[in-house]
Amino acid sequence: TKLLLAIDLGASGGKMFAGRLGGDVFRMEEIHRFEHEAASFFLPDSSGAVRERSCWDDTAIYREILRGLRLFRRHVGDRLDALGVDTWGADAQWVDADGEALGKVYCYRDHRLDNMVEEVRARISADRLYRLTGIHFQPFNLSNQVLWFATRRPRLLAAAAKLLPMPTLFNYYLGGCTQVDSTWASVTQMMDARRRVWSRPILAALGIPRRVLPVIVPPGSRVGLLQPALAQSLGLNRAVIVAVASHDTASAFAAAPADDPRDALIISSGTWSLVGRLIPRPVTSAAAMAANISNEGGIGNTRFLKNCMGAWIVQELLRVWEAADGRRMSWEEVDRLTPAAPPF
């Protein structure tokens, strides 16, 4: 029996599942769940102007991952064969040649990205960008984020040795791994959708050196082992770290309970709702571009989908109501009250 651990990180919370694979039977149980959210910082820039910045607390998320690993040790055992991390499909951390973080991890909802789509399009035509990547145009695409750093923080970019996407960042904390799988790389709007490599024309247009980007590997690749000292501190063996389908929607689509996923309409709903289907290869026609449909990497296929609003509106309402009266409403309470609420 193989003992596995899945670390599923969304934009508002995380879940960790212990899995047992033996013969033709796979069993899974949730062992840890936690909430997290971006924090607002009010930071002065080089001009002295104070600007609000929205950043992730990657240290807090990492601490919760360690808590989940300790719970695995307590409830499952001291043997762990493999683990994998998936995350939301935006944001990354810069590290220097010594492995030190260069600043905070910006959140994709930070307003510095509001006009970046237009800046990217000014450097490479929208038609060409879509033909190469098949990715829709959204402010949070990593292409917009790296252009912002290249144009607004050139000294940081000059000091950077590597850009670590969110799943890679936590694999790096756990085992020093710096690879990214193709499902996550696809949503950056910098990967060639057909060749599954970083697109040189796009990198040249954005002014991003290829050396700072991680190596792209197929989902399911073994990329490292738990650091020895970390494994010892957790009472575990040096488990294999796998670059899974690390864009959370890619993993969700792969696990969709459909008789034939190729003929199914799949909806993956969380903070965002992703609606689409699996197709053999990208469709980058003018009609697909006009509909703002994405061709995101899958496991041997392409996720042809539309990005829709999910539970984020409800999450924000819960946050505002808690700030107003100091009481945190549970999701169970939301479920109970929703049917009785008057329609708009």
Where are these regions (language model features)?
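Short beta-strand-loop/turn "lid" adjacent to the catalytic site in phosphate-handling enzymes
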Residues: 48-53, 72-108, 133-142, 171-192, ...
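Active-site core segments that coordinate phosphate-bearing ligands/cofactors
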Residues: 5-7, 18-20, 121-133, 144-179, ...
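Phosphate/pyrophosphate-binding loops at sites that engage ATP/ADP/AMP, CoA/4′-phosphopantetheine
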Residues: 65-81, 152-157, 200-210
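Short, acidic/turn-prone active-site loops that include or flank metal/cofactor-
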Residues: 33-34, 39, 106-113, 185, ...
